[in-house]
Every structure is written in C-alpha cells, then in structure tokens.
C-alpha cells in the first residue's frame, strides 16, 4: 500500500500565515493547531506533484547549551540531492497514526517518532524542552513548493546523542560559533534555520 502523508491546502495555509517565498515564518502555535485539525492525508505520489497542497514535515534541531548536533548525509542515503550535505535538522513526513492520541498530540507524537528513528539518547540524556520555532518555506525550488517545515529546537540535557543509521549519516556536536564553517555545504532548510534562528 502506498505511503500516505499529512498535508494542508496551500491557499488555506497562506490565509493563516504571512507569505514568505523563502525563509522562516516565526512560530504561531494557534496556526499549528488549525493545521493539525484541518489537514488531510494524501498519497505521497500525488502530494509530490501537486503544489496546491503542502506536505507537512517536522524538522528538529538538537541542541545542548551553545552546541548543535550537525548531521552529514552520506552516499548511503537514497536521496542523491542530499549526499554529503550537512543538516541541522532531523525529521520527515507525517503518516497516519492509529493510536488513541488526540489530534492536538499528533504533531508532537510524529516529531518524537522521527527523532527516535534517527537518533538514540543514552547515558541519562533527556529531552529538557521542545521549542516550536516556526515554519520553513522555500518556493524557489520544485521540492520546496510541495513541502513546508515545522522547525523545532529539541534541547537535551547532555551530549550523549548517537545516530541510529550510521550507513546513511554521521553527526557531531559543533559549537554555535563554529557552525558558519559548514554553511556552504548545508542543505537549504538548514541554511534558513541558521540565518533566521541560530545566528
């Protein structure tokens, strides 16, 4: 059966948010609630080709004090456009959830699921806070016209964070002051997060 992904009508989205062709639109929790209550699931093949809907993607930065967990995607990943690119965020598409959680809890549940797929927290490392930052949009490229990112910062209690799929990516903690060295090879959404949130 084909994957179903969570989407929201593009025209309706820009009635809720100030339009920005490329960049970060600062957090509005009331908009998040409207998205989760009124979004719908579409077949991924349809959603990838239909800019009248935006696929909702969770995109989470992991931080500990003034350090950020920087990912490097390897050639083991299926998405060739991202090979050897650096990324500040983990996340992905949101799929149907059959658990009894309320719709309001759905986004957070999907974010935590994506996080657990990508990394493991060991040796007492705990999530101290999950901060919603805003919406990342990039309508300047075809893939961006059918996606919008929900940018979060996940604050963890120590640096005992490890990659699950080491054949697909590597990662290391980088001090905030050193992140700019990696900017040229960051993927687009990471550049937006860096420009509009981190610096």
Describe the residue ranges of each PLM region.
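Nudix hydrolase/Nudix homology domain
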Residues: 6, 44, 84-98, 134-199
